[in-house]
């Protein structure tokens, strides 16, 4: 009810200003003890060798710098993913770079991995009092040539490894030039090989295993999805997140901000991302868990992704349009046996 009243006021503001204001307010409420803790009980879901207290996670992008983990943890998520973070701080693309398309319940962003850098993010993670499952989403700096991208991912992996429950490798944002080329078979083969080798070394060094997930785009042909699935199996990756934002604009061109460059999320992405999950599930045959993301605006959207083959789901744009109550709404449905029984 509270968010229903607040949303029209927030939507009067520039989208990025509203985003920052909302997070700052949550952080203040948490620090002053005024933010209630929503504990949502569920049969734990086991994936990546981890026991998730419920299957609904926060997608990367909302808390890029890990500065609001303690506050977001009180909203009832089963896990939280922060980032995308890069080795060095970078400002991202010029503003405005975040746009709502309310008529389509969509958001377009061309943020460009704006973040404070991996060292500061880790400092924030260490200061948070969150004890739950935390994913750290890593990427490459905008000025790093594609041929050196592996180095950026390895730098971030090494620094995140001791503090993350799992690490997500973002190779699918449309807002960093050439990044999506890392999904091509040759480039992905090299990247996954380097990541697994380093993961093994870090596991020996730290005495524990931190899983690796790969986040892919929704704008892939069937043959590309099959090739990616084959490489994920070959390199024994721990999970795949499907999907990131889309560059498609089908039916939105006539709407205000509907044709803004960048990645589109929200309701127009729902079916596209679920279709990718379905194809991945067919190729992976439950050997690697799928985390479903993209256009989850209701509990039924989340259920559709589970039925398509996902083990867990993540939300972001749905929170902007529905508010925090969406988390408990989805969890209530997904925790019923019928969802996982098919």
UniProtKB/Swiss-Prot annotation:
Its cofactor is FMN. Keywords: Cell membrane, Flavoprotein, FMN, Membrane, Oxidoreductase, Pyrimidine biosynthesis. One of its GO terms (molecular function) is dihydroorotate dehydrogenase (quinone) activity. It is a peripheral membrane protein. The active site is at residue 173. It catalyses: (S)-dihydroorotate + a quinone = orotate + a quinol. Binds 1 FMN per subunit. Substrate binds at residues 64, 109-113, 170, 175, 244-245. It comes from the Bacteria. FMN binds at residues 60-64, 84, 137, 170, 215, 243, 266, 295, 316-317. PANTHER family: DIHYDROOROTATE DEHYDROGENASE (QUINONE), MITOCHONDRIAL (PTHR48109:SF4), DIHYDROOROTATE DEHYDROGENASE (QUINONE), MITOCHONDRIAL-RELATED (PTHR48109). Catalyzes the conversion of dihydroorotate to orotate with quinone as electron acceptor. NCBIfam families: PRK05286.1-1, PRK05286.1-2, PRK05286.1-4, PRK05286.2-5, pyrD_sub2. Belongs to the dihydroorotate dehydrogenase family. Type 2 subfamily. This is Dihydroorotate dehydrogenase (quinone). It comes from Nitrosomonas eutropha (strain DSM 101675 / C91 / Nm57).
